[in-house]
Design a protein with these regions (language model features):
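Acidic/charged, solvent-exposed loop-and-adjacent secondary-structure segments enriched in E/D, K/R, S/T
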Residues: 49-70
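Solvent-exposed, flexible loop/coil residues
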Residues: 59, 74, 82, 96, ...
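Non-transmembrane domains of secretory- and envelope-associated proteins
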Residues: 2-9, 97, 106-109, 118-178
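N-terminal mature ectodomain segment of secretory-pathway/periplasmic proteins
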Residues: 1-53, 79-131
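Hydrophobic transmembrane alpha-helix bundles
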Residues: 31-44, 75, 166-177
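Short amphipathic alpha-helical patches
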Residues: 10-17, 68-69, 164-168
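Short glycine- and basic-residue-enriched patches
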Residues: 27, 63-79
């Protein structure tokens, strides 16, 4: 489970993620507010809105999400925009974590604190910080099972089960980390 907070509002989601060779499958169900399930197979993303009987089809941009933003392959290295400081160790959702802080080099960017699981590097918690270091929003796992058995076939079947839904192709808007 992931719990996130922005502007004092809390939301929670349940996430499944599995890798089979070079295929990644993921499902994210919102547990707060309007029901929504998002299923991803590599870069193909489908979001099911059961109340509206709509499913949107989208293509995810490679390199546009964490942790790829920290990779020089994503464009300019993160060090061009941030000073990176190791803050030590902590625990999130029962897992030992390394904590780093990204301090912006200019006034146009937010700062970040990131907790990553020691063994896998999986991001367990993030905080977005203002110029004074105050937390603007945060997201963290509240429960996590690494190496838990996930039925990849069930995730694949959900992507194929669009009967009774109106299919909408999402419009693409290219973004950059800068």
């Amino acid at each position: 489970f992931v719990v996130s907070s922005a502007s004092g509002a809390l939301s929670s989601s349940r996430i499944w993620h599995v890798c089979e060779g070079d295929v990644q499958l993921e499902r994210v169900d919102t547990l707060t507010g309007t029901p929504r399930s998002t299923v991803r197979r590599n870069d193909t993303v489908m979001t099911f809105l059961p109340d509206a009987r709509v499913v949107t089809l989208d293509q995810r941009q490679q390199g546009a999400v964490f942790p790829n933003l920290l990779s020089p392959a994503a464009g300019q290295p993160v060090a061009d925009f941030y000073d990176v400081r190791e803050l030590g160790r902590g625990r999130v959702a029962g897992c030992d974590a390394d904590i780093v802080q990204l301090l912006p080099r200019d006034a146009w960017r937010f700062g970040y604190r990131i907790w990553s699981e020691n063994r896998t590097g999986l991001v367990l918690k993030t905080q977005t910080l203002d110029a004074q270091g105050r937390v603007l929003e945060q997201a963290a796992f509240s429960e996590l099972q690494l190496d838990a058995p996930v039925q990849a076939e069930q995730l694949r079947q959900m992507m194929a089960s669009t009967q009774g839904y109106r299919l909408v192709q999402a419009e693409q808007a290219r973004t950059t980390p800068q």
